[in-house]
């Protein structure tokens, strides 16, 4: 039994790696960190969106590629081979999975299409579910969330949050 990546998965992963090598050199990342490269960061993000990173797991009916978690793992490894100043795990893996498995039909239609079109990016707040931190706490009353979470995956780029 073969446990490696398929040809398609390896090809996708290699494209991500090559893109980062070409577009996100250490000098570019230093400029972004120094606050001189907001446009550069947006260009890198858009380039990776053009490769389909935002719609890997989303079903085709919602504008996605309908690939599997192994593709997402291969892409994650490709992103990890360089420096990728973009949201990925929260916005493009965890959020689509949560919506696909926990959302109603209207939520799936609304949010999965918007993720595929790069109109929304999700942050994921899980730590309060596991254990509250000192000086933090999130309370949900009815349809309102109030409080402070100390950690949210992809929170700095989020337009929406899943708690």
Residue ranges and their predicted role:
Residues 25:
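Gly-rich Lys/Arg/Thr-decorated short loops/hinges at beta-loop-alpha junctions or inter-strand turns
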Residues 9, 20, 52, 59, ...:
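Buried hydrophobic positions in well-ordered alpha/beta secondary-structure cores of metabolic enzymes
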Residues 64-65, 105-163:
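Glycine-rich, Trp-frequent "lid" loop and neighboring beta-strands that shape
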Residues 49-109, 113, 117-118, 154-157:
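Internal helix-loop-helix
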Residues 1-8:
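Intrinsic disorder at enzyme termini
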Residues 39-53:
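Active-site-flanking structural segment that lines cofactor/substrate pockets
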Residues 28-36:
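C-terminal helix-coil-helix/basic helical segment that borders enzyme active sites and/or dimer interfaces
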Residues 14:
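Conserved "HGTGT" condensation-loop signature of ketosynthase/thiolase-family condensing enzymes
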